[in-house]
A protein has these predicted regions:
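Alpha/beta-hydrolase active-site loop
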Residues: 111-130
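N-terminal secretory signal peptides and thylakoid transit peptides that target proteins
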Residues: 1-17
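Short amphipathic alpha-helix adjacent to the substrate-entry channel of hydrolases
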Residues: 83-100
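Mobile cap/lid helix-loop segments that gate and shape the active-site cleft of serine hydrolases
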Residues: 31, 164-165, 169, 193-231
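Short beta-strand/loop motif that positions the catalytic acidic residue
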Residues: 242-244
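N-terminal cap/lid segment of alpha/beta-hydrolase-fold proteins
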Residues: 28-62
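Short beta-strand element of the alpha/beta-hydrolase
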Residues: 65-74
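Primarily recognizes the serine-hydrolase "nucleophile elbow" in alpha/beta-hydrolase
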Residues: 124, 128-197
């Protein structure tokens, strides 16, 4: 009992140190390490409609503190949940990373910016909770897939946007939503270009997913990461990793490459990696390119968290 009280005290002090601007000591991260996992779930908030938004926690079995990553799922803003990227989440967590995958509000229930508000809240919430799962709350990273990558880009570029900060975190009102780095697979980095591609290909489901999410319609431009850069908005620039399938006809490689170059030209640190022979969701299937993606994400995390 005494050891449990001591552990809880240390974890509580870890968050207080972060809130005060003091970074807790963190062990170096070895992406080749192997850990067992404890997987659990908790509710992290409820939507206006009363729907539970759950967080799935992949906690390495070790002492830590481990690097901490928030996973934002894809699904074209209209589908999927925290389990969508489970194979990737497990692969990252088994190397010694606390991975927390969260549900996001879906567009049929509430359009933009609801899911970005969820992500913003989730970062602040995770900063208060990471230590209780042996994670380091001082340097939160993000992994985002497809539309989750779009949310991740907005989250990272606009961490203090009052619209995105709209949901108060009562237990830590001063916590901020800044993140340290973002790794992404097939992010929708140019929302309007993707919509134009859907129209060209006559993909009714993709078109509908856009019209249900971007309400009013001009938000497809306001929330477009490419256009944010083109407008020279004042943004926060954290290191980005973009992994892109060369055969992706959902998010076109040329569009993705343009975003990467624009981010780089704006002074951002970005790695753009093309995966030959791969489509939009190649990481959903086992294979050499999926293994390569997992190793790439882990190496990217290592470079961020082990940097002096």
């Amino acid at each position: 009992m005494e050891s449990l009280r001591r552990r809880d005290f240390i974890r509580g002090m870890s968050f207080l140190s972060v809130a005060a601007g003091v970074k807790p000591a963190a062990a170096s991260y070895d992406p080749a390490a192997k850990f067992g996992l404890k997987v659990s779930e908790v509710e992290y908030r409820r939507t206006k409609a009363g729907r539970q938004l759950m967080a799935r926690i992949y906690e390495p079995a070790g002492t830590g503190p481990f690097p901490t990553v928030l996973d934002l799922h894809g699904g074209a803003w209209n589908a999927k949940d925290r389990k969508a990227e489970e194979p990737m989440d497990r692969a990252i967590a088994e190397s010694g990373v606390l991975v927390v995958a969260v549900d996001l509000t879906l567009a049929p229930e509430s359009p933009y910016p609801a899911c970005v508000q969820d992500a913003n809240y989730a970062v602040r919430w995770l900063k208060t909770k990471a230590a209780s799962w042996n994670g380091n709350p001082a340097k939160i990273g993000v992994y985002g897939s497809s539309s989750g990558g779009h949310v991740a880009e907005l989250l990272a570029m606009r961490p203090r946007d009052s619209r995105y900060n709209a949901i108060p975190l009562r237990e830590a009102p001063r916590a901020d939503a800044s993140v340290a780095y973002v790794a992404m697979r097939s992010p929708i980095s140019n929302t309007f270009a993707r919509y134009q591609n859907a129209e060209k290909l006559k993909r009714s489901a993709m078109i509908r997913n856009n019209t249900t999410f971007f309400v009013p319609w001009d938000t497809i431009h306001e929330s477009n990461p490419q256009e944010i850069l083109d407008r020279h908005e004042t943004i926060t620039k954290v290191p980005f990793l973009i992994m892109q399938g060369a055969l992706d006809d959902n998010v076109l490689p040329a569009v993705q490459e343009r975003f990467a170059q624009t981010y780089r030209d704006a002074g951002g640190d970005i790695q753009y990696r093309l995966f030959e022979g791969c489509e939009h969701e190649w990481v959903a299937q086992p294979g050499p390119q999926t293994d390569r993606a997992r190793e790439m994400v882990k190496a990217f995390i290592a470079r961020q968290v082990n940097a002096s």
